[in-house]
């Protein structure tokens, strides 16, 4: 049962990105709701960009309509790794372009981080920017980290500007289309690159209302004069946590740097970790943060929660039984994993009914579950279990997901059991995401009506 549980956990990842949100709206949802939704999407992309060719997170986003194009480009000694994605959201009547920069992953990346001396910042063309950066540092004037500046310069030359120094590609499209918004995002080095590129794009004429930056655990990019002169121009959601030393590292060890932007700090208990910079942790928190805002919108009557019963004409009814172990309840997971799993299954099944939600592990024998499901009108019975197992004298725990599918007579059609080790502060949603992809694929093979591709939406109609 433990392994079956982990598969369920995987469903968590899918769930939140799919937004199990509202069935209808009464009033417009808050900007916080929209911000937190896209923050969680950006967090998934920040994980995916580390392994762009074999990424569960990218595959999950693609299932929800995101078109993703990984990029790996080089100019001189600098190599850039990022991904460009886009999707259309009818609720906003906007096409969202998401550009995600990878954090530090090798020695070349760290060589960029360690080029901590500053260069002048300014100019409205690439030529002006380059010329100013080569001049002797001007005291009291805006200046930025030379390594980050070189990284962004490479991105601009290879992907942002044409031979005439004009915006091209998706950057040109966003600048010219009133129905487009660009989100620049990244973790650590990637977050610094996203922030500095955002400022460069504004200098090159990008309308500020069409641009937002979401950074996770990113160091400062410039000095106090830079923050004061340019910080208010760029909409920056700067996300850190109470145990991450990286955002303050340049100020602490080198001095002369200053952060700016809307600071969002996740509170990480010292009992979980004293130092935590991993992107997987930020992913967990961003999903949990979104769900908190979702619940707030429900309480305000702006959206309605997903029903525990749904019927689609012509689609078989599936009785959904979800079990959560007592062990899992005792673990310091950031989110309610059972809720994530349940919501994700709701998304996959055109017709479903959630059975006794308070059901304990040994509440009913198998024949009782079959009888109750048949009495309720089910054509199929899907039983899932989530568990968390801590090994003695070991860090972290194993999250397991078990999934078993039966016909209405109680005959087993398929069963899966998956598991993955995670650390106390990281990896819960990521582990669930990996299991989800396998679980959904197996269910679809048995039941072709199970959905594997979804329309992007901020809330369900």
Model-derived features with residue positions:
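Bacterial N-terminal signal peptides
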Residues: 8-20
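Boundary at the C-terminal end of the N-terminal hydrophobic targeting segment
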Residues: 21-25
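Serine hydrolase/lipase
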Residues: 28, 95, 125-133, 143, ...
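Short, surface-exposed "cap/lid" segments of acyl-processing enzymes
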Residues: 79-81, 90-130
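Gly/Ala-rich beta-loop-alpha elbow adjacent to hydrolase catalytic centers
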Residues: 186-190, 194
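A structural "domain/chain start" motif
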Residues: 220, 303-353, 449-461
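C-terminal/domain-edge helix-coil "capping" segments
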Residues: 310-318, 375, 406-461
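Surface-exposed short loop/turn segments
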Residues: 364-413
């Amino acid at each position: 049962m433990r392994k079956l549980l982990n598969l369920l956990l995987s469903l968590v990842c899918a769930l939140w990105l799919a937004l199990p949100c509202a069935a209808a709206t009464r009033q417009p949802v808050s900007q916080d709701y929209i911000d937190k939704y896209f923050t969680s999407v950006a967090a998934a992309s920040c994980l995916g960009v580390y392994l762009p060719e074999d990424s569960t997170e990218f595959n999950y986003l693609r299932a929800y309509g995101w078109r993703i194009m990984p990029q790996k480009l080089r100019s001189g000694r600098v190599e850039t790794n990022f991904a460009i994605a886009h999707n259309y959201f009818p609720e906003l009547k906007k096409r969202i372009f998401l550009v995600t920069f990878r954090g530090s992953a090798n020695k070349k990346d760290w060589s960029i981080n360690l080029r901590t001396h500053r260069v002048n910042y300014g100019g409205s063309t690439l030529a002006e920017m380059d010329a100013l950066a080569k001049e002797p540092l001007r005291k009291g004037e805006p200046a930025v980290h030379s390594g980050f500046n070189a990284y962004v310069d490479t991105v601009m030359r290879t992907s942002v500007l044409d031979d005439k120094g004009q915006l091209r590609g998706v950057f040109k499209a966003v600048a010219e289309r009133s129905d487009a918004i660009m989100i620049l995002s990244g973790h650590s080095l990637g977050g610094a690159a996203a922030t500095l590129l955002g400022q460069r794009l504004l200098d090159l004429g990008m309308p500020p209302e069409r641009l937002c930056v979401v950074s996770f655990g990113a160091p400062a990019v410039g000095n106090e004069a830079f923050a004061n002169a340019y910080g208010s121009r760029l909409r920056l959601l700067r996300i850190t946590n109470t145990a991450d030393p990286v955002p303050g590292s340049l100020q602490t060890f080198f001095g002369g740097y200053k952060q700016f932007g809307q600071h969002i700090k996740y509170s990480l208990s010292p009992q979980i970790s004293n130092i935590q910079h991993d992107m997987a942790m930020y992913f967990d928190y961003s999903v949990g943060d979104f769900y908190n805002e979702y619940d707030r919108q429900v309480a305000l009557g702006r959206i309605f929660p997903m029903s525990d019963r749904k019927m689609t004409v012509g689609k078989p009814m599936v009785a959904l039984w979800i079990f959560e172990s007592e062990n899992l309840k005792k673990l310091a997971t950031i989110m309610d994993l059972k809720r994530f799993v349940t919501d994700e299954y709701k998304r996959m099944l055109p017709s479903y009914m959630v059975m006794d939600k308070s059901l304990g592990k040994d509440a009913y024998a198998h024949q009782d579950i079959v009888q109750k499901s048949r009495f309720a009108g089910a054509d199929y019975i899907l039983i899932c279990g989530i568990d968390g197992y801590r090994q003695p004298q070991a860090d972290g725990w194993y999250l397991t997901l078990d999934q078993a599918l039966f016909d209405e007579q109680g005959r087993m059609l398929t069963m899966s059991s998956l598991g993955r080790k995670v650390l106390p502060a990281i990896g819960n949603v990521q582990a669930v995401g990996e299991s989800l992809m396998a679980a959904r694929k197996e269910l679809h093979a048995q039941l072709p009506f199970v959905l594997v591709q979804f329309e992007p939406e901020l809330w369900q109609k």
